[in-house]
Amino acid sequence: HTSDQHRWFQESRRSRDNPRADWYVWADPAPDGTPPNNWLSIFGGSAWQWEPRRGQYYLHNFLVSQPDLNYHNPAVAAQMLEECEFWLRRGVDGFRLDAINFCFHDPLLRSNPAKPPELRKGRGFSVDNPYAAQVHLYDNTRPEMLGFLERLRAVIDRYPQTMTLGEISSEDAIATVGEYTAGDKRLHSAYCFELLVDRFSTAHVREVIESLERRSPGYWPTWAIGNHDVARVASRWACPGVPTAARAKLLNAFLLSLKGSTCTYQGEELGLTEAELPLEALKDPYGIAFWPTFKGRDGCRTPMPWNDAAPQGGFSA
């Protein structure tokens, strides 16, 4: 997606016949004026927002202010590859691709089926989020993505010593990780939310590791036990009676002992805990929408303190 303030979207939303009219995902309303299907935003509510100037809805899998680009449009796909090459020419080492499986949607705009209550689980969203009540067959993780990843890899391979790392949240994230990294012609590596669960369980950790090795034997994994979307692991996996510092050392040792690469979220190596913030202090629209079951991401996005005993965390400004 882009911002709704981006010049591409500002042009696209003006009419149905401008040069960028098809650069975003636009759809006519249902006969009764409601959105074209039942797709939901992860951040709450419909994934469709009405635009009166076009008399159509636009798709936003995340915030209303983040309209989805239309990767089915060859001009959009080509432009995004050019954006990547722009930065590669400037010497970047590669790209971490956030929510990479959300680029493509079902062009027929079919509604997602319902998910049985016993199968609803949160991976990057809370279980009371209506998003958990659907099987996300049509709004993300579409087969067209594989071809685009191969085109992206062809661009990346022209620049030695660069790499791509994908973040994936899908119905079967381990399977998607395997598909998106298969054959040394798509992503170099990827990670999913399977170890970003709320509660620590030895059985779950073992199941995730063994499942990934069994189902994707040639895959070079990337592991993460924390990131900017979930509560800090020192708090999330806290153990009564075990000092935070000791547990943090154990968790870091565990992470670094796994086969593959690792992502360490800033402060994680120090055992930084979640900041407890009241509702009135939240800035994250995701947390405001789903308080108190999900308190948002502000608590894990605090700066890493230089000196926690000093004013302003030890920083001068």
Regions found by a protein language model. Give the residues of each.
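Conserved alpha/beta catalytic core and glycan-binding cleft of carbohydrate-active enzymes
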Residues: 2-38, 149-303, 308-311
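Receiver (REC) domain switch/active-site residues of two-component response regulators
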Residues: 93
